[in-house]
């Protein structure tokens, strides 16, 4: 179908098709993540980000492409999750800004908008890396600019853009050695290609295949957490204290999935069980006393791609407290000079952050990146003139920076990439000092700590010069896999032996749901025997998937 001009309605249809196609392929994009850890989430993050943009567009009823573009940009900005989601939002922010005054655009203007998006995205990334989504977007836009000098058909232009995006994606391993080593193309670039393929299908009048959408667990379990119902019971009456939700990407080669057996086996761990499944995914909601048992069982069937655990006793106490307050308007708490927003996964880690001064802890991290809007809401809830944000994950830093750019408060993003870095930064904070001095001290603190993790591999791969088998426990030091073992305790010993230097004085061990206090104490005994001068601190972090998070400083 030949299209000479693009109006708002046609562009809106393209956006919805692009979002749908990305959703269809999110699992395939996740599978391209370089690290074989159980939290590969590029596809998930891009899907959630694009879906947020598409929802804003769905609310529009206009032929004005500038207004549709602005809606897309707004939705993407606030819904962006992870570095890939933020870059996607910046690509379409630049695109939308370029067309914001136009009611419709031609092929040349469409190409110029693609290029404006690339320019905006490159500016948003402090150190752009080629062989990523940025390269794919840049090459596709360059192709569009060249072709648009003669081509007036937007469908033909989009065809060329999509073909060049795919060719550029296939070249990414030549630009980024780690992709070549692992044998994959860039996951973010693949996600962008999925969006472009959806755009093209829409322009051609083709329908993007729709898969059945699993019902929302939030909708299905809302009655379980209704505040009025909770206010009628006593906290001590809650037998199973942790609301546990997990999404499993089913792997039939791992264990054949039978929903009845799956449901029956899970029922032994708690009550209020709900299981929703299709051919590729299973969603679980259960109230359990030991959430780790649920996660361990679910892992037998495939990769855990989303986890949420909430302490219902703590929530219930909070609800009772809130509902017992007078209904009349009370004076809000006085505004504070400083506030600290941090991100953490695991009840124990969250409690640690609160105990050393965090104002708000956003639930999230390795397995669930918070959106820009989540971080914005947290900053506003602090009610402080100046807020420090500790992302504690390299994949959350860009969303934190994006949140900082849209709030009125003075915000400092301390680029902590790990939980230990975040804790060191928070301990360096002094409320009696000026904001800039605190920023300097916190930035210095994150440079002084070495961070390590122990988790398991979700697939066979070759990375960092090592052959890794599915199920192996990996020791990861400052982002590099240093070795593997068949059991998590041995992996932790290997990791700490590599990590600890002669100048280190304190080792902190945060053991997760897959480890135990007894095992952590064995690790402590190992360290005490090998390093007599080292002080060892052990905490139950209760984090999922990562058996140990450790630090040395």
Curated annotation (Swiss-Prot):
Disruption phenotype: No visible growth phenotype.
Gene Ontology terms for molecular function: glycerone kinase activity
PROSITE patterns listed in its UniProt record: DHAL
Domain DhaL: 9-201
SMART domains registered for this protein in UniProt: Dak1_2, Dak2
Entries under SUPFAM superfamilies matching the protein: DhaL-like
GO BP terms: glycerol metabolic process
InterPro entries assigned: DegV_domain_contain (IPR050270), DhaL_dom (IPR004007), DhaL_dom_sf (IPR036117), FakA-like_C (IPR033470), FakA-like_M (IPR048394), YloV-like (IPR019986)
NCBIfam families named in the record: YloV
Protein name (Swiss-Prot/TrEMBL): Protein YloV
Organism: Bacillus subtilis (strain 168)
Gene: yloV
């Amino acid at each position: 179908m030949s299209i000479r001009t693009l109006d708002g309605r046609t562009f809106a249809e393209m956006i919805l098709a692009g979002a749908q196609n990305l959703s269809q392929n999110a699992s395939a994009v996740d599978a391209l993540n370089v690290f074989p850890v159980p939290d590969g989430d590029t596809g998930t993050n891009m899907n959630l980000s694009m879906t947020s943009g598409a929802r804003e567009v769905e609310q529009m009823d206009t032929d004005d492409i500038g207004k549709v573009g602005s809606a897309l940009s707004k939705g993407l900005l606030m819904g962006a999750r992870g570095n890939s989601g933020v870059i996607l939002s910046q690509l379409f922010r630049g695109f939308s800004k370029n067309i914001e005054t136009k009611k419709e655009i031609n092929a040349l203007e469409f190409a110029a908008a693609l290029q404006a998006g690339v320019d905006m995205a490159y500016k948003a990334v402090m150190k752009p890396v080629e062989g990523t989504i940025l390269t794919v977007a840049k090459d596709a836009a360059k192709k569009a600019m060249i072709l648009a000098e003669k081509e007036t058909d937007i469908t033909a232009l989009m065809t060329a853009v999509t073909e060049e995006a795919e060719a550029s994606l296939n070249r990414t391993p030549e630009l980024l050695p780690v992709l070549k080593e692992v044998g994959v193309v860039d996951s973010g670039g693949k996600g962008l290609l999925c969006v472009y393929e959806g755009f093209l299908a829409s322009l051609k009048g083709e329908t993007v295949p729709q898969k059945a959408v699993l019902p929302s667990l939030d909708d299905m379990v809302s009655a379980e957490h209704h505040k009025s119902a909770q206010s009628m019971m006593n906290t001590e009456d809650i037998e199973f204290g942790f609301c546990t939700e997990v999404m499993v990407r089913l792997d039939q080669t791992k264990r054949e999935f039978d929903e009845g057996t799956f449901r029956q086996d899970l029922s032994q761990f708690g009550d209020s069980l709900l299981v929703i499944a299709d051919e590729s995914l299973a969603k679980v909601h259960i109230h359990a006393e030991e959430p780790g048992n649920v996660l361990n069982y679910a892992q037998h069937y495939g990769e855990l791609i989303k986890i949420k655990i909430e302490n219902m006793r703590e929530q219930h106490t909070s609800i009772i407290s809130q509902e017992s307050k007078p209904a009349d308007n009370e004076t809000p708490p006085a505004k504070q000079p400083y506030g600290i927003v941090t991100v953490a996964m695991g009840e124990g880690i969250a409690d640690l952050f609160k105990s050393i001064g965090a104002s708000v802890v956003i639930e999230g991290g390795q397995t669930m990146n918070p959106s820009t809007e989540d971080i914005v809401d947290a900053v506003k809830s602090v009610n402080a003139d100046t807020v420090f944000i500790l992302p504690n994950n390299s994949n959350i830093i860009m969303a934190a920076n994006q949140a900082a750019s849209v709030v009125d408060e003075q915000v400092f993003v301390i680029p902590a990439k790990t939980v230990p870095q975040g804790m060191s930064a928070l301990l360096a904070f002094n409320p009696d000092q000026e904001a800039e001095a605190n920023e300097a001290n916190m930035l210095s603190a994150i440079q002084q700590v070495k961070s390590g993790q122990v988790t398991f591999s979700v697939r066979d791969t070759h990375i960092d010069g090592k052959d890794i088998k599915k199920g192996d426990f990996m020791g990861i030091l400052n982002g590099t896999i240093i070795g593997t073992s068949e059991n998590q305790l041995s992996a932790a010993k290997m990791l700490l032996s590599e990590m600890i230097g002669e100048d280190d004085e304190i080792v902190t061990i945060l053991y997760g749901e897959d480890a135990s206090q007894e095992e952590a104490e064995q690790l402590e005994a190992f360290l005490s025997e090998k390093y007599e001068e080292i002080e060892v601190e052990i905490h139950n972090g209760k984090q999922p998937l990562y058996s140990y998070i450790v630090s040395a400083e």
